[in-house]
Amino acid sequence: MVNLLSCLLLFLLSLHCFVACLAVNTKNITTDQSALLAFKSLITSDPYDILSKNWSTSSFVCNWVGVTCDERHGRVHSLILRNMSLKGIVSPNLGNLSFFVILDIKNNSFGGQFPIEVCRLRRLKVLHISYNKFEGGIPAALGDLSQLQYLYLGANNFTGFIPESIGNLQWLKELDTSNNRLSGPIPQTISNMSSLEVLKLFSNYFSGSGGGGGEEEDEEEK
C-alpha cells in the first residue's frame, strides 16, 4: 500500500512538472509569435503576398514561411526572408526572440535605422541585412553579439564610423560593410578579431591608410 501511494505521488509530481513545462513552452512560443507578427505589421509592401497569406495565428508559427524552430526548445531559431521584395522597417520586437540564431533578410527594401534591440540576441550567429536601404549609423551594440560569426551589412546607406566595439566579436569569420557611405578611420580594433577570415570594406569614404580596403572577392555575394 505504501509503495502504491509512493508511486501515485511520484506520478502526480511528474504530471505537475510536465504541465508546468508545457505551460512555459506555450508562453515562450507565444512570445515568439507576437514578435514576428509585430515584424509583419511594419511591412508596407509584400508584393507576392508571402507573409500576408501565410503568417497567420490560424497556423503554427514554426510552419510559417521563412521561420525555423529549434527542435530541442521549440523556439523560433531563424528567420530567412531573402529576395522577397519586402518593404518596410524592421520591428524592434525581434529583440524578444531570445533563441534567435539566424536573421537573413538580404535583398529586400527594408529601410530606416536598424533596431538596436536586435543586439540583445546573445545567441545570434548570422546577421545578413545586405542589399536593403538601412540608414543612419551602425549600432555600437553590435559588439555585444558575442556569438556572431557572420555579419553582412553591405549595399545599404549606413553612414558614420564603424564602431570600435566591432572588435569585440571574437568569433566573427566574415565582415562586410562594403558599398555604404561610411567614413572616418577604420577602427584598429578589427585587428583583435582573431577568427576573421573575410573582410570587405570597399566602396566607402574611409580616411587614413587602408581606407576602403579589405579583401575583395570575385565570387558571388552570399
Give residue ranges: language-model regions.
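Plant-biased, solvent-exposed loop and capping regions
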Residues: 1-222
